[in-house]
UniProtKB/Swiss-Prot annotation:
InterPro entries to which the protein is assigned, alphabetical: FlhB (IPR006136), T3SS_substrate_exporter (IPR006135), T3SS_substrate_exporter_C (IPR029025)
Keyword annotations: Bacterial flagellum biogenesis, Bacterial flagellum protein export, Cell inner membrane, Cell membrane, Membrane, Protein transport, Transmembrane, Transmembrane helix, Transport
Top-level division of the source organism's lineage: Bacteria
Transmembrane segments: 36-56, 92-112, 152-172, 194-214
Function, in words: Required for formation of the rod structure in the basal body of the flagellar apparatus. Together with FliI and FliH, may constitute the export apparatus of flagellin.
UniProt protein name: Flagellar biosynthetic protein FlhB
Subcellular location: Cell inner membrane
């Protein structure tokens, strides 16, 4: 009951940090059915392209042993080793391709789902992995029921397919008892192909469904409560590095927003290279000029550059520029102490427009 209530309280989507932490610990969505489909596909490729020739060679080898037993004397240990080595080599030549295919397709299916990464946490011993209580929850929980349903589905499908194939080839199956080894292997391969094709389609369907369900279940398990979101936010904002990064980002955004306001300015008051203050005055908007941008050094040069591109008058008055830079702030009206000096500059702007764009 407590576990259900805990899940119900997890109403928030997992944060990037929660997902990143889970990934670092090896907690990633992984569908075993995709691997099962890849293995089935590997076996089908083996049966179609390798098994026929391999089985024929194997049958011929066994045929020689059974039809010409006198050629294989077992008088000494050396004779026995020679016979066993012959059979083992023939068997190895037959099964080696399927092992290679299974490994390649198995690794490929894992990489398809998640890129490989070393995770020490997964190989460290933990009590909950051998705990009976934890095992009981895994078996009888939602995940356990889903796994049971998938296993039951595969057993039913394989059983039905095997019965139908053998029933369809009932007489051919009976005739195998009286056939030569080559015919027996050929018939078995034909039946095996039919079985694997149907199983391949079944596992493909199951793999697609399970792939989406596994990712959905993994995402749901990572969901967070509102309190967890608040705690994580406090923790991240409390980190000095994160705070510094946030302040830097905020300054960058404010600077970009301020620079974008320069074309709206009425005039620029500047110290030749160190300070620049952009003022906007429209009688219908405010009773006094408003500071739309200000900066020093490189920012001041940028303000002047934009102003000159937009035909905004630039007045070089070092004492006034320094004094205003120290006492005004962006998006606020200028203090009354500057009214007279700024009013004279605005009057010069109105008198000179549009002929004069820069006054020294």
């Amino acid at each position: 009951m407590a576990e259900e209530q805990d899940k119900d309280s997890k109403t928030e989507a997992p944060s990037e940090k929660k997902i990143s932490d889970a990934t670092e610990k090896g907690n990633v969505p992984f569908s075993r059915e995709v691997t099962a489909f890849a293995s089935t596909l590997a076996i089908y490729i083996f049966v179609v392209f390798f098994l026929s020739d391999g089985a024929a060679n194997m049958a011929e080898a066994l045929k020689d042993i059974f039809e010409q037993p006198e050629a294989w004397r077992l008088d000494t240990a050396t004779d026995a080793v020679a016979l066993i080595s012959h059979v083992v080599l023939k068997c190895a030549a037959l099964v080696l391709p399927v092992f290679i295919l299974l490994i390649l397709f198995g690794v490929g299916s894992s990489i398809f789902q998640n890129l490989p990464r070393p995770v020490l946490d997964r190989i460290q011993p933990k009590w909950n992995r051998v705990s009976p209580a934890a095992g009981f929850k895994r078996i009888y929980g939602v995940q356990g029921l889903v796994e049971f349903g998938k296993s039951l589905f595969k057993i039913i499908v394989v059983s039905i397919v095997v019965v139908l194939v053998l029933w369809n080839d009932y007489f051919a199956t009976l005739d195998m008892m009286f056939s030569d080894p080559v015919t027996i292997f050929t018939t078995m391969i034909s039946d095996l192909k039919q079985i694997i094709i149907v199983v391949l389609f079944a596992t493909a369907t199951l793999a697609i469904v399970d792939l989406f369900w596994t990712r959905h279940h993994w995402y749901t398990e990572l969901r967070m409560t509102r309190q967890e979101v608040k705690d994580e936010l406090k923790q991240s904002q409390g980190d000095p590095i994160v705070k510094s990064r946030l302040r830097s980002m905020q300054r960058d955004r404010a600077r970009k927003r301020m620079i974008s306001s320069v074309p709206r300015a009425t005039l620029i008051i500047a110290n030749p290279t160190h300070y620049a203050v952009a003022l906007r005055y429209v009688r219908e908007e405010s009773d006094a000029p408003v500071v739309v941008a200000m900066g020093k050094d490189l920012v001041a040069l940028k303000i002047r550059e934009i102003a000159e591109k937009n035909g905004i008058p630039v007045f070089e008055d070092p004492p006034l520029a320094r004094s205003m830079f120290a006492q005004v702030s962006v998006d606020s009206v200028i203090p009354p102490v500057f009214y007279k000096a700024v009013a004279e500059l605005i009057h010069r702007v109105y008198a000179a427009q549009p002929q004069q764009r820069r006054v020294t």
